[in-house]
């Protein structure tokens, strides 16, 4: 049986179709989910894609968090369903309290769009098992509100429990994708929940799945092959 991975479309989503294509390339079946529907159509996992849902009014992800579909996503995530939040999806996950912390405006107050160097910190989640811990990858990044923040106690907890999933790689030229692009505390690019089934990150793996587009690399494809293997072997 083919694994079914749902992709939610909110008003203002930009990358839902790209995410569906990435899922298909990985060998799973993408399933379109609408923000007004509570029915997840018997999917095995869910992706909240990037974009500017509801125009980022009030706060990025704050309105989407109350969409009817999110009631079911929150319930299922707490029961163990794998959920991935990409960019705006990450913002929604923090607003829904499925992941700790919050996303604020970039420290330089500008929209940023570039290829970004990341280091895999946790390769034991539902979405990262096809990577190796310490592996460095290139993933496109595009955001205005990408600065991850949390209080020191939460940051220390994430570090101690190995819940920092990805970190921006510093120490090189920005033109080569190095550096913290938005002022995220402790260079955090992505985190996971305690169970490892919910992951959020700001960069866009769905834009790095084919060699002819994006970075010219396929460094984002393991997100989708990781979850496929987990679902098939469950």
Curated annotation (Swiss-Prot):
Catalytic activity of the protein: N(2)-formyl-N(1)-(5-phospho-beta-D-ribosyl)glycinamide + L-glutamine + ATP + H2O = 2-formamido-N(1)-(5-O-phospho-beta-D-ribosyl)acetamidine + L-glutamate + ADP + phosphate + H(+); L-glutamine + H2O = L-glutamate + NH4(+)
Protein name: Phosphoribosylformylglycinamidine synthase subunit PurQ
PROSITE patterns: GATASE_TYPE_1 (PS51273)
Catalytic residues in the record: 87, 204, 206
Listed Gene3D superfamilies: 3.40.50.880
Species for this entry: Streptomyces avermitilis (strain ATCC 31267 / DSM 46492 / JCM 5070 / NBRC 14893 / NCIMB 12804 / NRRL 8165 / MA-4680)
A Pfam family it matches: GATase_5
Pathway linked to the protein: Purine metabolism; IMP biosynthesis via de novo pathway; 5-amino-1-(5-phospho-D-ribosyl)imidazole from N(2)-formyl-N(1)-(5-phospho-D-ribosyl)glycinamide: step 1/2
